Amino acid sequence: MSITAAQVKELRELSGAGMMDCKAALADTNGDMEAAVDWLRKKGIAKADKKAGRTAAEGLIGIVSKDTSAVLVEINSETDFVARNDLFQDIVRNVATAALDTQGNVESVSASFYPGSEKTVEATIKDAISTIGENMTFRRSAKLSVKDGVVATYIHSKVAEGLGKLGVLVAVETTGNKEAAAVFGRQVAMHIAATNPLALTAEDVDSGAVEREKAIFSDQARQSGKPENIIEKMVEGRLRKFFEEVVLLSQAFVMNPDITVEAALKDAEKSIGAPARITGFIRFALGEGVEKKESNFAAEVAAAAKG
């Protein structure tokens, strides 16, 4: 099959590999992007991408919290110019506020009333599209709550209060001091913004992802020519390292890399004054996995794709 310049560009962004390697990988896997990433990894050309996804859309992430709940919303625009518009920012903030009184998903939020209006969120966004003159998409929304404790929040690349390019929620269940729990929770939220973990615990990691890593590690280990029993131990070691990289509680804590997040939680219990648990987290990066219309791709890539 014919490999396009856009496919080569996408694989380069996902894998960090060179143009010709990406072209060879796509040709050998009939254009299957996921298989091409695995092909490059087996060759030792690309590293694991914990959450493959192109960040291309404009817009904003909004965060609002109240009592023991907090929400994240993402609303996309066509240009960054509109994302800096006061009306657009008000809409993102108000949609997040509306989400607090719903189940938190896009469907329930869209059908709810827009704050201070008799119109729904969906209708208000449609009206705003006409006013602003640019398409807007209410892409996703999520809500996190605790029975007793705090939901800490963090906005990265902040453009206004509660608005930015990346947002994180962290649920900390505890009967202890809520202010101390919130301080620690915010540190964990900043950690998550930086490390982008796949799951809270090893058990939460998708079994398909684990099997995929195991298959790749096995292929890499067999290239060493070592006996099967040694290969098995090599794979176990690499899987252990994989979990340390993608599981939140097992990751080295960004604020103190000498300890894990789980150990940092135990330390934080001293200031919290009671046992504490991280029960969940949500991370939204603007445009994650969204493909923006291509304008004009570099001529060198087009030439490489043509061969």
Swiss-Prot record:
Gene Ontology molecular function terms on file: translation elongation factor activity
Superkingdom to which the source organism belongs: Bacteria
Chain intervals for the UniProt region annotation (Involved in Mg(2+) ion dislocation from EF-Tu): 79-82
InterPro entries tied to this protein: EF-Ts_dimer_sf, Transl_elong_EFTs/EF1B, Transl_elong_EFTs/EF1B_dimer, Transl_elong_Ts_CS, UBA-like_sf
SUPFAM superfamilies reported for this sequence: Elongation factor Ts (EF-Ts), dimerisation domain (SSF54713), UBA-like (SSF46934)
Disulfide bonds: none
GO cellular component annotations of the record: cytoplasm
Compartments it resides in: Cytoplasm
Pfam family for this entry, one: EF_TS
Sorted UniProt keywords: Cytoplasm, Elongation factor, Protein biosynthesis
Function per UniProt: Associates with the EF-Tu.GDP complex and induces the exchange of GDP to GTP. It remains bound to the aminoacyl-tRNA.EF-Tu.GTP complex up to the GTP hydrolysis stage on the ribosome.
Family of the protein in this entry: Belongs to the EF-Ts family.
PANTHER family per the UniProt record, alphabetical: ELONGATION FACTOR TS (PTHR11741), ELONGATION FACTOR TS, MITOCHONDRIAL (PTHR11741:SF0)
Protein name as annotated: Elongation factor Ts
Organism: Bartonella quintana (strain Toulouse)
Gene: tsf
